[in-house]
Amino acid sequence: MSAAPLDYKKALEHLKTYSSKDGLSVQELMDSTTRGGLTYNDFLVLPGLVNFPSSAVSLQTKLTKKITLNTPFVSSPMDTVTEADMAIYMALLGGIGFIHHNCTPKEQASMVKKVKMFENGFINSPIVISPTTTVGEVKVMKRKFGFSGFPVTEDGKCPGKLVGLVTSRDIQFLEDDSLVVSEVMTKNPVTGIKGITLKEGNEILKQTKKGKLLIVDDNGNLVSMLSRADLMKNQNYPLASKSATTKQLLCGAAIGTIEADKERLRLLVEAGLDVVILDSSQGNSVFQLNMIKWIKETFPDLEIIAGNVATREQAANLIAAGADGLRIGMGSGSICITQEVMACGRPQGTAVYNVCQFANQFGVPCMADGGVQNIGHITKALALGSSTVMMGGMLAGTTESPGEYFYKDGKRLKAYRGMGSIDAMQKTGNKGNASTSRYFSESDSVLVAQGVSGAVVDKGSIKKFIPYLYNGLQHSCQDIGCESLTSLKENVQNGEVRFEFRTASAQLEGGVHNLHSYEKRLYN
């Protein structure tokens, strides 16, 4: 005779009689002696209690010791992923982009400057012109800088006596390029007095409905400027990653660890760089340790992300040297063949967990780099302890990534390649370019590839793709029962958030199956 069912009202009380919570703790899951190395596909996070809307989930997180982002999304410093356009929109959408260094130092610095000039608070060094500047010269400047509002001072310098303002409306229909701006400029532009706050300045722009607010001192000398376009960007991109002091967009860039990279970094810092990545496939080297020491002595305010690493021993050396953040991953990227060719690396889930467990004790945020293919992988990387997730392949093929689209077999594609591919190594010559220095191959007569070249399908703009990732990650945290990335980390460590190991058949079950055909649309 079967036992009578228990009183349903005592279900919660009965649950307490179990010796442990359902599923595995993160420590049990990541026991390499039992399960070996794990990737993101090898496990799932178990659901928790949902008692809040997904829109309430905060995705604020640390990039480095001093830099906080509103989203954990970071674009990779690859020459087919991140240049100025990608870095601009990654920052506007709450993340940050790291501009690649497979180009000349001046080209890279120019891209950093373009990001920093895209959005400002007070523009303390506005580009000014003199009354004798011609309309033709202004048109050239408009094409060069991407904007057309230029203050006019007596000597064409700032600070300098303000005499007017030239905007696109002043020159839009002028065909005579030889005219000087003193004949066409607005002679009484709207001004504010030096010392007003950013909030007060923006309020003047709203009330006057003008495009520019010129800030002058008591003697009428131009000292700075506010732009209405920046005010609109503030409204359209509320999560934007900005400097707390300048209100400019945050921008990162990568450099190598050879001597020439020191001068490259000087140019990047002059352009306004906020954070630098030391770009090495194997970050635990004397070259990187020496570079960290030099940067800390030369640019003490510049944040440094070191790597790549996959073990806590690697991490310990870089943390002790003064790294402000770590980049985790070796051979897990979709275009990377390091594990295959070099027999060196680590499954990404195991690498992220072990390095983060160590680094987080020292307050050093970690970035999971490689192996991320979807929102679920992002969630798992963050649950294992990383603070941010770097994406290469996920952002390749977007409108903002470098390169031109081409068609093959009816598909619209863009090139995507690993920085360890032969193509990338030979882009600017073998000696000391970004790819050869990243893989310590500057002096090699025969190059050994650690990456491949390929193509990816057009993904559209990240202006749609990043919000899709953002909303998806919020829903994922809601399912787990965590209202923030901070609480996700805490609840993983204290055992509240549980995991389950997936067998091969479980992975098949968790994907689309038993359909004749289907269309997989991720977002509209």
From Swiss-Prot:
Belongs to the IMPDH/GMPR family. NAD(+) binds at D279, S280, S281, G329, M330, G331. CDD domains: CBS_pair_IMPDH, IMPDH. PANTHER family: INOSINE-5'-MONOPHOSPHATE DEHYDROGENASE, INOSINE-5-MONOPHOSPHATE DEHYDROGENASE RELATED. This is Inosine-5'-monophosphate dehydrogenase 4. Catalyzes the conversion of inosine 5'-phosphate (IMP) to xanthosine 5'-phosphate (XMP), the first committed and rate-limiting step in the de novo synthesis of guanine nucleotides, and therefore plays an important role in the regulation of cell growth. SUPFAM superfamilies: CBS-domain pair, Inosine monophosphate dehydrogenase (IMPDH). SMART domains: CBS, IMPDH. Its main location: cytoplasm. Its EC number is 1.1.1.205. The keyword Transferase does not apply. The active site is at C336, R438. The lineage of its organism: Eukaryota, Fungi, Dikarya, Ascomycota, Saccharomycotina. Its cofactor is K(+). Keywords: CBS domain, Cytoplasm, GMP biosynthesis, Metal-binding, NAD, Oxidoreductase, Phosphoprotein, Potassium, Purine biosynthesis, Repeat.
